[in-house]
């Protein structure tokens, strides 16, 4: 893992430098509101310890909550936007490049060359997705993708999100293959009619594939994979 630890560590410096910019300040207001309404005892305990108790008392007071969200893998949309901005900083100054498994770049280029339409659906913001593939260790891969989706299209555990994605791609869901490392996402995509595969990679937190086929090397993948 490179990107998430980098964003976590860089949060204080980034907010110190950019916290008053209007677009960042708007994101921080959304984070403040989410924190205020977060029912989790851990979040509220942090809030009690935070310096000041009102929005506008300083961007730095939000750092513990933002880091807590990262540590608990809570995909708050304004946090994802902030992470994307932090990664853009890191990519821009050469501090980071995006790591990919060794088989991924060749597979993406092969699929694109075969005329397959490629899309990304991630909890990370669309700009963050595009930055990742633009600054991969294997070069700029962003041009291989035709469509980009984040949680603004809907939650990844809801079948309706996948119906919307298929419509945006101009395809019937049955013509779409969705690959994920999360069983709940596979179930939702399958519920929308898509073919699905579990990406089984080292370090995946949950490798339960349920009734679905696994794949651990994209060089093994062919267009009919996952279709029943």
Where are these regions (language model features)?
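Short secondary-structure boundary/capping segments
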Residues: 1-4, 135-137, 194
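Conserved phosphoryl-transfer catalytic core
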Residues: 1-67
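Metal-dependent phosphoesterase signature
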Residues: 39-102
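Short, well-ordered alpha-helical scaffold segments within catalytic/effector domains
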Residues: 80, 101-105, 159-163
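Substrate-recognition element of Asp-dependent hydrolases with the DxDx(T/V) motif
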Residues: 84, 93-99, 104-136
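Short, solvent-exposed loop/turn segments at secondary-structure junctions
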Residues: 87-88, 125-127, 183-184, 203-204
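Asp-based, Mg2+/Mn2+-dependent phosphohydrolase catalytic module
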Residues: 138, 143-228
